[in-house]
Amino acid sequence: MNIMTANQGAVSPSQTESEASPPTFSHVPVLATEIVEALAPAPGKVFVDGTLGGAGHTRLLLGRGATVYGIDQDPYALDRARQAALPGLHVLQGNYRDMAELLPAAGVTQVDGILLDIGVSSFQLDDAGRGFSYHTEAPLDMRMSQSGESAADVVNDLDETELAALIYEYGEERHSRRIARFIVQAREKAPIETTVQLAEIIKRAYPGFSKGIHPARRTFQALRIYVNDELGALRDGLSAAEGLLAPGGRLAVISFHSLEDRIVKRFLLGSDVLTPLTKRPIVAAESEQVDNPRARSAKLRVGERAAAPEGS
């Protein structure tokens, strides 16, 4: 990998998870070996997992003796983490964009590393009732925290121009105007309330649809990002991380699409505090991509805060 050598070697994800967690609360983390190499967890070190989710990455850190403050806004993820009672894990409710307030409130002012795994956890995607998937019938929700407007509110309330702009900006969907027009026409007949209902509308709008990437993928991505203000949270979280890292501390960010990766890349290049350790994003090995298809689009970038001068 194109990254500075960590103080500790990589660890087998399966070995670490079996040592650190019960089987009832499981999640397969992407780029597991690369995260351990980048953050070098060890006894006495303190880390933040800003996107706790299924705690897959947190287990990797805990398994090497580190302390982890896990942040999540999803009540379901928080409940599962508390029930798992993982030794060394402190669970904080909130959005990682607010970690500069959440951590001091928990008595933490500096940490050795911060991990952000942006996007939706696998267990959230697999929970049909959350409304993230276009494959399964469910209420059109997509909210991480269950507060604020839902995806159904968005598709039924925004005008056609606003919808098209949203789908294009956050989904990079070239057929955004046509999709927005079909959505508006459909909701004039009946409110759009479910995932499959919306997916079928998009499928009808998509010209020349054939087997392959589902035509609803980019629109669903756009709605999820908009509903949860994911890009705004990422920008705020990156800025907050700068002030929390101890000298020599590292920030590791896993993104899953180009919008996020561009934000992370530009932030690290423009930071006066952090030095990028990855000239190019680290991607999953072919073997991991075969075993875990969700790893195919994962990109890891790492930055480091300068170490304190000797004698200081």
Curated annotation (Swiss-Prot):
S-adenosyl-L-methionine binds at residues 55-57, 72, 96, 117, 124. The keyword Oxidoreductase does not apply. Residues 1-24, 288-312 are annotated as: Disordered. One of its GO terms (biological process) is rRNA base methylation. Keywords: Cytoplasm, Methyltransferase, rRNA processing, S-adenosyl-L-methionine, Transferase. Disulfide bonds: none annotated. Its EC number is 2.1.1.199. One of its GO terms (molecular function) is rRNA (cytosine-N4-)-methyltransferase activity. It is found in: Cytoplasm. It catalyses: cytidine(1402) in 16S rRNA + S-adenosyl-L-methionine = N(4)-methylcytidine(1402) in 16S rRNA + S-adenosyl-L-homocysteine + H(+). Specifically methylates the N4 position of cytidine in position 1402 (C1402) of 16S rRNA. Belongs to the methyltransferase superfamily. RsmH family. This is Ribosomal RNA small subunit methyltransferase H. It comes from Deinococcus radiodurans (strain ATCC 13939 / DSM 20539 / JCM 16871 / CCUG 27074 / LMG 4051 / NBRC 15346 / NCIMB 9279 / VKM B-1422 / R1).
